[in-house]
């Protein structure tokens, strides 16, 4: 909740550990790996690199992903998925076919596939989230992949997996039934009725093969699609009993409009998107007279600035490799705040992508660069545990062209009863004004500041480079003491602050 105060007043944040929203799903801190550009090849997989392990996986990339505490990784796409035959990526590498990959107009070598992905997930301690092809693929090919991954030996595709050196099932729990099938750009694009019927039948077969799995339905690719939200309504009504999540996607950027105040208020758009989808879920549940629940999976989200997206038929082309500035990091931080504020309906989220492609990690042969956006994700994934809290905020308003008057502070919070710790995450959107803020703690009152971090600067375009890799990075700060359940802190203009109290 929010109320307005005058600009010269001290902002107030009220937190009561008894005013909770929902349990925070660990799967909110997921990532996405697609066969696009250099995400897989030269990203996570680079056997020629001295920085790779014996399996060809980049050790520095995996260390960075472990640092960010990724809980799940979605694979193999993305638009790539809708033209992908999963059989191309299993078995002896010397027999795997080279293909013209149509989604990104690249050459796919298939040297990295399902089993290599499973090994990668184990090494970073993340749960695999597989996707099945609903473009050129069939409901049978979807069921076959589930059998390959999850069935015990004794049938065709489980035995095939065993012959490839993996006798034990991978036991993949989460399965996306297609990707962005509402988009005309998608290979094998279907209309809403065609997709819904195909997805329902695919999910039935997949769950018959492996009854414990959870399935993700393709929702709208973004909130500006002409079929939004009718696509979602039709797909949900048709498939409700067979699906566990509705996928939503969104990207944003400030490179075209160059409207920084509105860009720094992007959480308004993000939150509206979730609210519309939550209402659609409630409607579909009522319409189907069901006791079954379906939640949201925001399994593609990121700042995406303009850049090349066609590979001109080369291997591992440099596609969509754009740097991320301080203002981009503050937008990412707001996205994460929305995840906590909507934890009652949003249970899965996967940032696109984990390295090189529209990513806050970039590789080259001799190292790894972290952009500013790396830090809000890392801090929240490490601090936010337990339940999300319903923060009450009193702060000034800032004027924006797209969203009208917006609170200058964007806030989310968490409370973990097991460790008796509170996490607080604050964005100061102001381009010019620092904000003195009182954090008022109620309930199980914290007494100490265990961690305090800030990412701040005076230039919204400040960006890390290979020459200056720490130009925009989160730094530990000395926070004032908590006195009588209150912590007063100064929030610089253009800043992100993460606190862990205990």
Task: Kindly label every feature range from the protein language model.
Residues 2-231, 236-245, 267-271, 275-308, ...:
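Non-catalytic accessory regions flanking glycosidase/transglycosidase catalytic cores in CAZymes
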Residues 249-265:
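Active-site His/acidic residue clusters
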């Amino acid at each position: 909740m929010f109320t307005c105060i005058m600009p010269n007043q001290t902002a107030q944040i009220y937190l009561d550990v008894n005013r909770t929203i929902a349990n925070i799903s660990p799967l909110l801190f997921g990532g996405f790996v697609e066969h696009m550009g250099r995400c897989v090849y030269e990203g996570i997989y680079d056997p020629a690199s001295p920085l790779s392990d014996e399996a060809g996986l980049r050790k520095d990339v995996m260390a960075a992903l472990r640092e960010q505490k990724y809980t799940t990784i979605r694979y193999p796409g993305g638009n790539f998925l809708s033209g992908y035959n999963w059989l191309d990526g299993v078995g002896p590498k010397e027999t795997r076919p080279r293909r013209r990959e149509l989604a990104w107009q690249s050459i796919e070598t298939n040297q990295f596939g399902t089993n290599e992905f499973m090994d990668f997930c184990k090494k970073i301690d993340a749960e695999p989230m597989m996707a099945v092809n609903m473009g050129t693929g069939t409901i049978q090919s979807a069921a076959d992949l589930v059998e390959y991954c999850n069935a015990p030996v004794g049938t065709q595709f489980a035995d095939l997996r065993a012959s490839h050196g993996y006798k034990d099932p991978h036991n993949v729990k989460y399965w996306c039934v297609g990707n962005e099938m509402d988009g005309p750009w998608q290979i094998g694009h279907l209309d809403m009725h065609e997709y819904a019927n195909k997805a329902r039948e695919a999910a039935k077969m997949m769950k018959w093969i492996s009854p414990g799995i959870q399935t993700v339905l393709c929702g709208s690719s973004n909130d500006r699609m002409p079929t939004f939200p009718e696509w979602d309504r039709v797909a949900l009504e048709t498939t409700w009993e067979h699906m566990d999540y509705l996928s939503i996607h969104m990207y944003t950027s400030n490179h075209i409009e160059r409207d920084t105040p509105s860009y720094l208020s992007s959480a308004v758009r993000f939150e509206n998107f979730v609210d519309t989808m939550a209402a659609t879920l409630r409607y579909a549940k009522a319409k189907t007279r069901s006791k079954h629940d379906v939640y949201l999976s925001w399994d593609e989200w990121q700042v995406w600035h303009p850049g090349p997206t066609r590979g001109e038929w080369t291997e591992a082309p440099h596609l969509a490799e754009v740097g991320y500035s301080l203002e981009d990091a503050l937008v990412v931080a707001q996205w994460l705040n929305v995840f906590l504020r909507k934890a009652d309906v949003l249970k899965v989220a996967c940032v696109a992508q984990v390295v090189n492609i529209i990513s806050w990690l970039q590789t080259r042969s001799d190292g790894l660069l972290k952009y500013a956006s790396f830090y809000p994700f890392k801090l929240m994934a490490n601090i936010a545990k337990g339940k999300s809290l319903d923060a009450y905020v009193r702060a000034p308003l800032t004027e924006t062209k797209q969203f009208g008057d917006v609170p200058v502070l964007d806030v989310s919070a968490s409370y973990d009863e097991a460790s008796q710790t509170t996490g607080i995450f604050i964005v100061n959107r102001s381009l010019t004004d620092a904000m003195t803020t009182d954090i008022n703690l109620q309930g199980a009152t914290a007494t100490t500041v265990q961690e305090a971090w800030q990412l701040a600067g005076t230039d919204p375009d400040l960006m890390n480079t290979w020459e200056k890799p720490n130009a925009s990075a989160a730094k530990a700060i000395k926070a004032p003491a908590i006195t009588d359940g209150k912590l007063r802190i100064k929030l610089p203009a253009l800043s992100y602050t993460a606190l862990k109290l205990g």
